[in-house]
């Protein structure tokens, strides 16, 4: 009976080890995907204490081996819990990264108007508040979603012309204006880096460019602060 119990315990240990290996692989896959380097102190302990035992099983040694296997089973369960906690933490961190608008929204880096106060581009002398970045680019060039989220609005929006607004998590929203073509519709889910439209000059615009805005809890912020 004790030999049968020992065999069952050994089988549990094998299953624990297989489960642990799968979780650890998942953690490392998440780390590689997002380029995360795991600090040494954050890693679950790699060594498993109390592993070992006689090479041949005799009846008099069965109790000792069963105790060793029980200890190993408990250690593997604790380590699995640690890796699961780490995996949950990584997923939360990765989700936050996906929802943070820190990508550049188009191929061109040529900013013609920065965030903040400026002269009105239509009359050249009156003061004007500019709540985003104006980035000049070729007509028809791609526009990218700078973070993942749901398209809150896609269509014509007053002086912004063809316009997209995306609602991300953590209070972030992004807006893309004066576009020539819109590839996504209201209610669509877009992923970070996805092409959502083309550079244009619709609405109140002096030439092909992208007007790009970032809002945090409804307040316009400088997009450069996140890049």
Task: Give the positions of each predicted feature.
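Catalytic cores of peptidoglycan-degrading enzymes
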Residues: 103-227
């Amino acid at each position: 009976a004790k030999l049968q119990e020992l065999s069952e315990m050994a089988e549990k240990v094998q299953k624990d080890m297989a489960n642990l290996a799968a979780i650890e692989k998942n953690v490392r896959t998440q780390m590689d995907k997002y380029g995360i380097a795991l600090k040494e102190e954050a890693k679950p302990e790699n060594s498993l204490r109390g592993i070992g035992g006689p090479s041949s099983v005799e009846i008099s040694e069965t109790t000792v081996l069963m105790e060793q296997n029980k200890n190993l089973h408990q250690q593997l369960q604790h380590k699995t819990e640690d890796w699961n906690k780490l995996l949950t933490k990584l997923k939360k961190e990765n989700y936050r990264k996906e929802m943070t608008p820190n990508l550049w929204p188009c191929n061109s880096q040529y900013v013609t108007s920065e965030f903040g106060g400026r002269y009105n581009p239509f009359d050249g002398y009156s003061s004007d508040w500019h709540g985003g970045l104006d980035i000049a680019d070729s007509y028809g060039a791609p526009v990218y979603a700078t973070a993942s989220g749901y398209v809150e609005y896609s269509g014509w929006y007053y002086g912004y012309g063809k316009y997209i607004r995306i609602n991300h998590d953590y209070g972030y929203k992004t807006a893309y204006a004066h576009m020539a073509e819109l590839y996504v519709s209201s209610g669509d889910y877009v992923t970070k880096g996805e092409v959502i439209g083309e550079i244009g000059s619709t609405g109140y615009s002096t030439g092909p460019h992208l007007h790009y805005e970032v809002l945090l809890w409804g307040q316009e912020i400088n997009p450069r602060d996140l890049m």
